[in-house]
């Protein structure tokens, strides 16, 4: 097999001249045109004498194993895909790829070695159902996506300090990751990986969006600001401790974490959008949000909690729904908050196991009743239906997960009670 676009005549002549007149036959740079495709090791051997290749290189076809020798830089992208017989690949001399490193649909690939790779724009590893090892010396990258692989470790990314996108999903044998990331300018997402995934992002100070699903343990020891949305959905976390976090710019969602019994956000003062805590069956005492002062959207807290401490709350620009099945929960403090004008949206609902209070803030009528009065049923019925939608949508099937799990969502802000529920429901689809 031949390259679709072979080395340029200039590069070949350069190599020949060096072979005739020098002790080395390695040209400093070889151009492969805009792009070239290699379907055999013999094709790769033609450029093995180059320290730099210019252009986009694609490797595909029936290769049992393949290697790029001597090449230190690719001024372009390297794509390895759709090779049903490729079992291993190595390019241990490459230090820099100015474009992307793409590996996709390599069904028997067990190892990929880029031991010297320090810089790349993006790495995309998708549908690698046999891979067990992937090694790099990565220091700089903009985007990392690892999806549908059998990797047990992604330590090849552990030294990265900053990225735009870090998305690790549907890797069923991946159970732990310890990161050195300090900032994420677009999104950090972990979802549908191993059943007992343990994560540590203790150097992370700032992120734009964070969404975690199907995680067993998480540590954010230094996180201070989330510029947009923060979501913890369908996890098996026993606790959440984000004690350095002071601001979430848009929505904060803690939904369907069945084993969560403690949430500590002791320095959080501002949630810029919707704020929802829902369907966390073991979360009986919610006292870790006692410094929250403003919520820029709606607020919803539903579950079986007996204690809810929002003692610093001064302003909710949307509606409010507080619904506990525990008869030990008291609405008194929240009703006082509403009567003082802090709830600025179109409705206020507060229920416990025995009483219900519903207020249509757009009108002058207010009703309180025992055991679900008619006015409360009207106002909170839609909320119950919406919350059921949240619960029903909290997981979707994934072909590579052991259990049904959904893709990581982008959570959006809301400006009313129904808005925040609808926003989270849409996000979880």
Swiss-Prot record:
Compartmental location: Cell membrane; Secreted, Cell wall
Modification(s) after translation: The GPI-anchor is attached to the protein in the endoplasmic reticulum and serves to target the protein to the cell surface. There, the glucosamine-inositol phospholipid moiety is cleaved off and the GPI-modified mannoprotein is covalently attached via its lipidless GPI glycan remnant to the 1,6-beta-glucan of the outer cell wall layer.
Phosphoserine: residues carrying this PTM: 339
Top-level taxon of the source organism: Eukaryota
GO cellular component, one term: plasma membrane
Keyword set, alphabetical order: Cell membrane, Cell wall, Cell wall biogenesis/degradation, Glycoprotein, GPI-anchor, Lipoprotein, Membrane, Phosphoprotein, Secreted, Signal
Membrane topology listed for this record: Lipid-anchor; GPI-anchor
GO BP: cell wall organization
Lipid-modified residues, GPI-anchor amidated glycine kind: 406
Ranges for region Disordered: 361-410
Span of the signal peptide: 1-19
Biased composition (Low complexity): 361-401
Statement: the UniProt record of this protein carries the keyword RNA-binding: no
Propeptide boundaries: 407-429
Positions annotated as glycosylated: 21, 56, 82, 196, 209, 227, 234, 241, 267, 279, 304, 328
Reported function: Required for proper cell wall integrity and for the correct assembly of the mannoprotein outer layer of the cell wall. Important for apical bud growth.
Family: Belongs to the SPS2 family.
Protein name: Cell wall protein ECM33
């Amino acid at each position: 097999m031949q390259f679709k676009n072979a080395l340029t005549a200039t590069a070949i002549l350069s190599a020949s001249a060096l072979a005739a007149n020098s002790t080395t036959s390695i040209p400093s740079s070889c151009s492969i045109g805009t792009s070239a495709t290699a379907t055999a090791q013999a094709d790769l051997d033609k450029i093995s004498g180059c320290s730099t290749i210019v252009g986009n290189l694609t490797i595909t076809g029936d290769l049992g194993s393949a290697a790029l020798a001597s090449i230190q830089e690719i001024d372009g992208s390297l794509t390895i895909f759709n090779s049903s017989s490729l079992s291993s690949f190595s390019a241990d001399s490459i230090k820099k790829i100015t474009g992307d490193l793409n590996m996709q649909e390599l069904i028997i690939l067990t190892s990929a070695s880029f031991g010297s790779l320090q810089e790349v724009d993006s790495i995309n590893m998708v549908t690698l159902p046999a891979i067990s090892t992937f090694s790099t010396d990565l220091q700089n990258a903009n985007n990392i996506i690892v999806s549908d692989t059998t990797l047990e470790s992604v330590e090849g990314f552990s030294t990265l300090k900053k990225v735009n996108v870090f998305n690790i999903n549907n890797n069923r044998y991946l159970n732990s990751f310890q990161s050195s990331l300090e900032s994420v300018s677009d999104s950090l997402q972990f979802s549908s990986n191993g059943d007992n995934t343990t994560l540590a992002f203790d150097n992370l100070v700032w992120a734009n969006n964070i969404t975690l699903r199907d995680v067993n343990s998480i540590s954010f020891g230094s996180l201070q600001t989330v510029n947009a949305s923060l979501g913890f959905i369908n996890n098996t976390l026993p606790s959440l401790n984000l004690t350095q976090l002071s601001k979430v710019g848009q929505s904060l969602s803690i939904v369907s974490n069945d084993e969560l019994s403690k949430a500590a956000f002791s320095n959080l003062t501002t949630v810029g959008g919707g704020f929802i805590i829902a369907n966390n069956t073991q979360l009986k005492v919610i006292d870790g949000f006692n410094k929250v002062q403003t919520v820029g959207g709606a607020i919803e807290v539903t579950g079986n909690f007996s204690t809810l401490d929002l003692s610093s709350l001064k302003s909710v620009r949307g509606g409010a729904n507080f619904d506990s099945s525990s008869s030990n929960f008291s609405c008194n403090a929240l009703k006082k908050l509403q009567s003082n004008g802090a709830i600025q949206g179109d409705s206020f609902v507060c229920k416990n196991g025995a009483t219900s209070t519903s207020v249509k803030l757009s009108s002058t009528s207010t009703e309180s009743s025992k055991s679900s009065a008619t006015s409360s049923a009207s106002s909170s019925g839609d909320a119950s239906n919406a919350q059921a939608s949240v619960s029903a949508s909290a997981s979707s099937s994934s072909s590579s997960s052991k259990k049904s799990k959904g893709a990581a969502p982008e959570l959006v802000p809301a400006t009313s009670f129904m808005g925040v529920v609808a926003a989270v429901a849409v996000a979880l689809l």
